[in-house]
């Protein structure tokens, strides 16, 4: 049976209603975006895309799907097309979505049905996150039926907000089917230039929603929906007419079958011309062939979908395999899928077999431990087995859950991973017992009464790195497994409703349960970071004080602290909660608010804040005439100032208003800090805020408080999903304090390799405490995309083993961390420019990327630090686009230059104060601010780079540090597999000890992609 993408359907029956999760064809090549003739005006017909030769990009395979309750291709299905001419990139997509759901406004398009498109214009992002030029935009229908295009991240080309330059059309194309068409001007994708470049990094998501809530998505690659990881994008390559080819895919209508079921096998074939085609289907059970059938179909340009219904007979074992060999004019392909015969009973038997194997291995492990063998590393596999079996066995007792999320194939896959894990662990233990493997004992200093010194956590005199999961109640039930996994930390939370549900009500059962859990955790040597976030607003408080629901702010608090009742609620919560838990010595930190921000004055302004601002401006300027001169406005008086309007039209006013917001936000944060210290004196405090908001132009202002001053108020710098640049920034702003990421997200797509690589890069760039979201066995689209820790056994094992490595090498890692604030090269961090120069954040990010591969650490230097003379060891200060500076900054820059400092800025840079008045001059060396230009400058100045790498193309990150008379250096290759020959003081290094493996290595060696290696060279 055949259904072409044009919509003609010839199906013998229907098989919608079941979730699908089948093995699929791997797609790893480029997509070829063919040229087309202008003009392309969009008739609203897929036939037009076919006529122009567009190749299909099928989002049809299992790896493309992040919709837990997907019910087959007749539920949600999407095929994308791209074309180009000299002026536009054309985007087309045919989408079937059985139950549409839309958002009221364009900024939330990703929460409804519609597309997100992400671009790495120069295909140059090699570090986690987005770099300066990366772009993310979206298309979709709004609730009122209109079509909208929106930019969430504009890179160097676009402002955040609605996209007027994109021509968009959305046309009904059949039952539950829409054709999306968009013309994106190439100028919107700068610095990509189709006249000079032929490829760019790209990802596309189709988001599907139900009842206004994001259900999940189909994507080409990971890297947008879960976390922003542009280095995972694949390439779109510009091609001429008729050049290149597309890829085929296969899927099934559900994840598992029973005897007698009908199965619907869908083939997505990249046909390019009309003609007759055939598919030869073969069904096998093991080596035995049980069915063979040949199906003819009519091939069309732009792709053809072949639907083949197969009536399953009796199923035995794990099921059947379908092999499909398709042939059509000009092409052929071979695909396969499994018709799985799974049942809870069968998987319970498999679980029992894994459990018995794990029990036998535990006995072996205990015997080896008693004999003095260091078993920390193979023990991680056993811990993963225990915890995975625990939660999956629970799942197997819940038929509705198994059906809703199509869990049986996923559970089967996890059990296979457990067996493979145990196999490796058994071999590793045998090697340790025989002496064939070198033991790597892991120190276990007590996780209680930790102190902070020189930017690091200490247990006594030992530096410690803290790593573990964030969850709710489940971590307290799994303390033994957490410890055996290699973790030394965990985190949990209580909300306001659980402590003070109303002004006259107090509940302490949750607090006492936390206290009991902490005492139990101490037995397993686990530290605890307590998220005491006073959110959401309890209904009892809102009923008593309805004003608390007005002017929402404070991140997850959801209520402005200008409300006296909100402050009273926070005080009451912590007054009752903290005395119950504060005396536990393994309570090492309090996280004050989940994803805190000071967002008062972003979209609306509280009357108290407005009055304070007007009074502050009157005090600052004295007369409205003086204020108007700075702002370039014609305001009548201070009492009529409207910040919400004026900040949109006056750069000088925006600077004054955002500076005022910063001061007010600091007062808010001091209130939170002082309240917590009142009830838990001596416990270190931090506050979690989303990291991207610090240095991102579209997300920066809502936080409202500068990271530097925020870090000075708390005991260490807290964040959520920090990237390498943010971590360098934090360590620079508060050099003597640790940095934490207390909500790092992982998805079901996170591989073991990525898990290890991300942890190492974060710690080496200054992170001392890291928590993974989330330790829970629950299911939702959000958790599968961003909190799937207990659903990826192999990756969880990799995290546990990496945690052991980090704990073992904590002194060496801390040595690298301390090199960041001692760096000789710094980037100027200018809050004034962050407020007033739209292109500054992107240029700052680009300069950081250019500096990241020159074999020396990079720090940030703030305007405040400059003015205070706190320049550390900085010899070179780079000013990338910070054109508006405080007047005292200009004076400090002149002083820095007078002390032999070098200031680098782009040619033609002109500096003014925040209001546009020219600043006194200071010596500047003009530079292109590229890696090559920086490298030449550093050689000229003789900067300290004792160990140099040899990998070309800016793909190597290398840092060095001296410790105890030895030279340490680490290397991370962000490019293809290359031969690596390091140089020490200009001479090739012959050999070194690789500290993670403990092995002696000889150079040159082959350096894999994103595998961290730490070397020690002794004198």
Question: What is each stretch, according to the model?
Answer:
Residues 19-34, 240-495, 500-505, 574, ...:
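Mature N-terminal, pre-catalytic/accessory segment of carbohydrate-active enzymes
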Residues 553-716, 720:
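Polysaccharide-binding and catalytic clefts of secreted carbohydrate-active enzymes
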Residues 20-282, 286, 323, 329-332:
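Structural preference for beta-rich elements and adjacent junctions enriched in aromatics
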Residues 455-456, 466-473, 490, 512-513, ...:
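Extended substrate-binding grooves/exosites of carbohydrate-active enzymes
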Residues 463-472, 493-511, 552-571, 596-600, ...:
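The substrate-binding groove and active-site-proximal loops of carbohydrate-active enzymes
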Residues 257, 266-268, 330, 393-445, ...:
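Carbohydrate-binding surfaces of carbohydrate-active enzymes
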Residues 476-552, 672-679:
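Aromatic-lined substrate-binding rim segments of carbohydrate-active enzymes
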Residues 471-484, 571-576, 696-709, 751-759, ...:
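Short, acidic/polar
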């Amino acid at each position: 049976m055949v259904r072409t993408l044009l919509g003609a359907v010839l199906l013998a029956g229907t098989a919608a209603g079941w979730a699908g999760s089948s093995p699929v064809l791997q797609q790893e090549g480029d997509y070829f975006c063919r040229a087309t003739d202008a003009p392309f005006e969009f008739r609203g017909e897929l036939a037009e895309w076919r006529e122009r030769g567009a190749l299909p990009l099928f989002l049809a395979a299992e790896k493309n799907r992040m919709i837990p309750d997907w019910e087959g291709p007749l539920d949600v299905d999407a095929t994308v097309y791209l074309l180009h001419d000299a002026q536009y990139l054309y985007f087309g997509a045919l989408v079937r979505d059985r139950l549409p759901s839309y958002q009221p406004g364009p900024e939330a398009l990703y929460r409804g049905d519609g597309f997100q498109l992400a671009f790495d214009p120069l295909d140059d992002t090699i570090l986690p996150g987005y770099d300066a030029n990366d772009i993310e935009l979206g298309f979709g229908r709004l609730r009122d039926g209109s079509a909208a295009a929106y930019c969430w991240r504009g890179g160097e080309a676009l402002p955040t907000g609605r996209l007027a330059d994109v021509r968009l059309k959305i046309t009904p194309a059949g039952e539950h089917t829409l054709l999306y068409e968009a013309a994106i001007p190439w100028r919107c994708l700068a610095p990509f230039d189709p006249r000079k470049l032929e490829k760019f990094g790209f990802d596309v998501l189709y988001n599907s929603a139900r009842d206004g809530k994001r259900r999940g998505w189909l994507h080409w690659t990971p890297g947008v929906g879960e976390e922003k990881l542009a280095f995972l994008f694949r390439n779109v390559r510009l091609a001429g007419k008729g050049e290149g080819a597309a890829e085929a895919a296969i899927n099934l209508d559900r994840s598992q079958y029973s005897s007698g079921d009908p199965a619907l096998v869908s083939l997505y074939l990249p046909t390019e011309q009309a003609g007759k085609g055939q598919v030869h289907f073969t069904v096998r059970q093991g080596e035995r062939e049980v069915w063979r059938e040949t199906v003819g179909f009519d091939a069309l340009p732009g792709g053809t979908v072949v639907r083949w219904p197969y009536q399953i007979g009796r199923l035995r074992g794990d099921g059947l395999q379908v092999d499909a060999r398709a042939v059509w004019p000009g092409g052929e392909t071979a695909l396969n899928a499994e018709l799985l015969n799974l049942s809870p009973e069968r998987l319970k038997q498999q679980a029992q077999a894994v459990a018995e194997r794990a029990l036998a291995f535990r006995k072996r492990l205990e015997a080896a431990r008693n004999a003095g063998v260091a078993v920390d590393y193979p023990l991680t596999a056993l811990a993963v087995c225990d915890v995975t079996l625990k939660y999956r066995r629970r799942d197997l007792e819940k038929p509705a859950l198994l059906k809703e999320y199509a869990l049986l194939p996923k559970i089967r896959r996890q059990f296979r991973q457990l067996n493979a894990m145990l196999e490796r662990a058994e071999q590793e233990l045998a090697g340790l017992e025989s002496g064939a493997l070198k033991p790597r004992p892991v120190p276990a200093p007590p996780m209680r009464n930790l102190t902070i010194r020189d930017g690091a956590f200490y247990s006594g005199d030992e530096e410690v790195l803290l790593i573990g999961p964030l969850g709710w109640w489940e971590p307290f039930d799994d303390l033994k497994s957490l410890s055996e996994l290699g973790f030394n930390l965990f985190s949990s939370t209580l909300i306001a409703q659980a402590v003070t549900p109303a002004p006259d009500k107090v509940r302490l059962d949750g607090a006492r349960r936390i206290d009991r859990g902490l005492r139990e955790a101490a037995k397993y040597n686990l530290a605890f970071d307590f998220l005491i976030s006073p959110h959401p607003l309890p209904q009892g408080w809102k009923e008593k004080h309805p004003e608390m629901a007005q002017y929402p702010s404070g991140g997850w608090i959801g209520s402005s602290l200008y409300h006296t009742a909100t402050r009273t609620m926070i005080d009451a919560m912590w007054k009752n909660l903290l005395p119950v838990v504060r005396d536990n010595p393994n309570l090492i930190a309090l996280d004050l608010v989940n994803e805190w921000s000071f967002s008062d004055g972003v979209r609306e302004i509280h009357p108290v804040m407005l009055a304070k601002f007007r009074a502050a401006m009157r005090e600052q300027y004295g007369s409205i005439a003086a204020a108007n001169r700075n702002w370039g406005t014609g305001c009548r008086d201070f009492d009529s100032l409207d910040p919400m309007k004026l900040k949109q039209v006056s750069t000088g006013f925006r600077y004054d208003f955002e500076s005022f917001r910063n001061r007010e936000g600091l007062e808010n944060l001091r209130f939170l800090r002082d309240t917590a210290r009142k009830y838990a004196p001596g416990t270190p405090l931090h506050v979690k805020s989303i990291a991207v908001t610090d240095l991102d132009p579209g997300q920066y202002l809502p936080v409202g408080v500068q990271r530097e001053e925020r870090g000075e108020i708390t005991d260490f710098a807290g964040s959520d999903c920090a990237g390498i640049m943010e971590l360098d920034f934090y360590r620079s702003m508060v050099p003597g304090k640790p940095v934490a990421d207390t909500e790092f997200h992982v998805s079901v797509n996170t591989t073991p390799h990525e898990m290890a690589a991300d942890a190492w890069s974060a710690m080496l760039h200054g992170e001392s405490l890291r928590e993974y979201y989330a330790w829970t066995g629950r299911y939702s689209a959000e958790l599968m995309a961003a909190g799937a820790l207990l659903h990826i056994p192999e990756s969880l094992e990799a995290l546990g083993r990496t945690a052991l490595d980090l704990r073992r090498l904590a002194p060496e890692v801390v040595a690298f961390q301390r090199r960041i604030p001692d760096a000789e090269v710094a980037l100027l961090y200018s809050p004034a420019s962050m407020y007033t120069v739209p292109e500054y954040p992107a240029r700052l990010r680009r300069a950081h990327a250019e500096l990241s591969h020159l074999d020396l650490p990079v720090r940030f230097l703030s305007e405040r630090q400059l003015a205070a003379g706190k320049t550390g060891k900085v010899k070179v200060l780079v000013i990338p686009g910070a054109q508006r500076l405080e007047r005292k900054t200009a004076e400090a820059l002149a002083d820095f230059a007078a002390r032999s400092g070098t200031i680098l800025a782009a040619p033609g840079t002109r500096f003014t104060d925040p209001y546009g008045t020219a600043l006194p001059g200071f010596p500047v060396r003009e530079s292109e601010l590229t890696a090559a230009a920086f490298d030449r400058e550093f050689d000229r100045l003789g900067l300290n780079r004792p160990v140099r790498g040899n990998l070309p193309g800016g793909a190597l990150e290398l840092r060095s540090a001296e410790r105890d008379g030895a030279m340490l250096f680490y290397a991370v290759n962000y490019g293809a597999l290359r031969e690596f020959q390091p140089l020490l003081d200009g001479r090739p290094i012959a050999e070194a000890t690789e500290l993670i493996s403990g092995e002696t290595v000889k150079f040159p060696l082959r350096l894999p992609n994103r595998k961290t290696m730490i070397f020690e060279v002794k004198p």
